[in-house]
Amino acid sequence: EIGYMFGQYKRLTNRYEAGVLTGKGLFYGGSLARKEATGYGNTYFTRAMLQTAGEDFDGKRVVVSGSGNVAIYTVEKVQEFGGKVVACSDSSGYVVDESGIDLALLKEIKEVRRGRLSEYAQIKGEKSGVYFVRSGDGSIWDVSCQVAMPSATQNELTGKDARQLIKNGVMAVGEGAN
C-alpha cells in the first residue's frame, strides 16, 4: 500500500516530501484528480503547443492511442476543447468512429465492464461509420488526424509511425503515455 510506503519513507529519511510517491491518499498529499491528471495535463500542454502556432483543438481530428486512464481523460478534455477524437485503441486493436468517439460508451466499456474496444464497434455498428481493426492488421497511426496523442505506453511511436503521421497531415504530437 502506498500510504504504508510513504510512512516508511518519512520514517527512514526523517523528511516529509509529498512528491516522492504517486497514488497516495489525500491525507498524505495525494491528488483529488489522480485518475484524470495525466490525460488532462497532456491535453493542456498539447493545446499550448497548438496555440504557439496560432491553432487550437477546435475542429481538429485527433487520434488517441490507449483506452486506460490517460487516454480516457485525454479524450474527455480534447472533446471539451472542441476537438473530435476519431480513434482510440487497446491491446486487441483500435476503433475508428468518424462521428467522434462516444466518451460515455468508452467509459462504460473500459471502466465499468472492463471490456475490449471491439465491443464499441459491435454496439455502434458498422453502418454508423464505426469499425474495429485488430492488432497486427494495421496501426492506429494510419488513421488520418491533425493531432496525435500517444496515451497507451511510453515510446510507442516508431520512425515508421512518425512518417505515416506526417504523410497524413499531423501538425502536433502530444505524448501522455508514461
Where on the chain are the PLM-derived regions?
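ADP-ribose/adenylate-binding Rossmann-like module
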Residues: Q146-N178
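Short amphipathic alpha-helical segments, especially helix-boundary/capping motifs
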Residues: Y16-K24, M49, G159-L165
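Generic structural hydrophobic/aromatic packing signal, biased to beta-strands
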Residues: I2-M5, V62, C88, L106, ...
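N-terminal ligand-binding/catalytic initiation module
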Residues: E1-L32
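Glycine-rich phosphate/diphosphate-binding loop of Rossmann-like nucleotide-binding domains
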Residues: K24-G25, G30-E36, Y40-W141
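General beta-strand structural signal in soluble alpha/beta enzymes
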Residues: R15-L21, V64, A87-D90, R134, ...
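A glycine- and small-aliphatic-rich helix-loop capping segment at beta-alpha/alpha-beta transitions
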Residues: G7-L12, Q79-K84, G169
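Charged/polar, solvent-exposed surface patches and flexible loops
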Residues: Y4-G7, E108-E111, Q164
